[in-house]
């Protein structure tokens, strides 16, 4: 088993199949690792080494390394691929789309509407992920030291309208999710079914 690799980042590129590939120079040996694109946020300055936590997948025809900036992401990845029908690329897509904290929160809360925002994840797959992992992740989240956030966001009757409006204004789905999660911490707003109020608060947060 390879727990982690530490070396210099040679390149970070998008492959023809839309995967993110990191090449790491470890003692003059180049390792190619498939990584979440979010790893860009953790890249070190030039001439500094980076530690990447790894998962090794052994196939009949090849060995594939997956890399993560933090060990909790790697551990979550391993739990995701243990779910029937969830392969490594879909697990990476889940982590990339929602991020560590929001993904764990969505699974623990059985928030399938959040999970299906990931390309390739349909309603049945989202339900299966939540069913198989919510109890495990609720316990693991505490052990991993992840923050427990209150459930936040518009009530179901207005959520779709709010999201569609913000997306139409040019915000990405990730920006929209984070904005609604952030402004939803406002107790009064969380109980508000006024679509316009949610949109105003979200835009104000995104404009900071």
UniProtKB/Swiss-Prot annotation:
Residues 70-148 are annotated as: Domain II. Its main location: cytoplasm. SUPFAM superfamilies: DNA helicase RuvA subunit, C-terminal domain (SSF46929), Nucleic acid-binding proteins (SSF50249), RuvA domain 2-like (SSF47781). GO terms for molecular function: ATP binding; four-way junction DNA binding; four-way junction helicase activity. InterPro entries: DNA_helicase_Holl-junc_RuvA_I (IPR013849), Hlx-hairpin-Hlx_DNA-bd_motif (IPR003583), NA-bd_OB-fold (IPR012340), RuvA (IPR000085), RuvA_2-like (IPR010994), RuvA_C (IPR011114), RuvA_C_sf (IPR036267). It is found in: Cytoplasm. Keywords: Cytoplasm, DNA damage, DNA recombination, DNA repair, DNA-binding. Residues 149-159 are annotated as: Flexible linker. This is Holliday junction branch migration complex subunit RuvA. Pfam families: HHH_5 (PF14520), RuvA_C (PF07499), RuvA_N (PF01330). It comes from Acaryochloris marina (strain MBIC 11017).
